[in-house]
From Swiss-Prot:
Belongs to the azoreductase type 1 family. Its cofactor is FMN. This is FMN-dependent NADH:quinone oxidoreductase. It holds the Pfam family Flavodoxin_2. Binds 1 FMN per subunit.
Length: 210
């Protein structure tokens, strides 16, 4: 199994989402030595935001692209190749102003590309990125999975929507909630997330042994 880990929190290694997602990937690797891992660290190596050269370059024949168009479209090609090569995708993000990080949004902009990850046909758009299992690891200061605050969670609906549009409909969410509500809340949130990670790993081990 090929695993793609995408981390995006501006807090880097100190981030709860990065920590849990990284531990998740490492446990999957340990569970099966044949598994492989590719890490896309969007903090250490941020992707450029799409611009006019990208917008025109993706519709320009390769041989006719300007050097700048070739550069920015080349970035998109690299992250798309990483995505298509993966069987399992782990996306880690903090909950920033009720949504995903801007670094992760830039990654989404590079993978959501007409002609490569989706195509328009007689019946409308069709996602071309299929057969993937996606896990979203989301850390938030408050609790947004239930109660009145649910209305402020634009991160998970957005990611489910855009990933589904591209063909990735098998999506699970691992939340690390309430980390801004005191040390005890942090401990509880991390324990709950770790338990879910361990359950997923155990399930995959059982399936492989069956």
């Amino acid at each position: 199994m090929s695993i793609l880990l995408v981390t995006s929190s501006p807090r880097g290694a100190a981030s709860h989402s990065t920590r849990i997602a990284t531990e998740f990937a490492e446990k999957l690797l340990a569970a099966d030595p044949s598994n492989t891992l590719v890490v896309r660290d969007l903090v250490a190596n941020p992707l450029p935001h799409i611009d006019a050269d990208y917008a025109t370059g993706i519709y320009t024949p390769v041989e006719a692209r300007t050097p700048r168009q070739a550069e920015v479209v080349g970035v998109s090609d690299v992250v798309l190749d990483e995505l298509f090569a993966a069987d399992t995708v782990i996306l880690a993000t903090g909950f920033i102003n009720f949504n995903i990080s801007s670094t992760l949004k830039s990654w989404v902009d590079h993978i959501a590309r007409s002609g490569r990850s989706f195509a328009y046909g007689e019946n409308g758009p069709k996602g071309l990125v299929t057969g993937k299992k996606v896990y979203i690891v989301l850390a938030s200061g408050g609790i947004y999975s239930e109660g009145a605050a649910v209305q402020f969670d634009h991160a998970i609906p957005y990611l489910r929507g855009v990933l589904g549009f591209l063909g990735m409909t098998d999506v699970d969410v691992i939340r690390i909630e309430g980390v801004g509500m005191g040390p005890d809340a942090v401990t509880a949130a991390l324990a709950k997330a770790t338990a879910k990670v361990d359950a997923v790993v155990a399930s995959q081990q059982a399936a492989a042994a069956a």
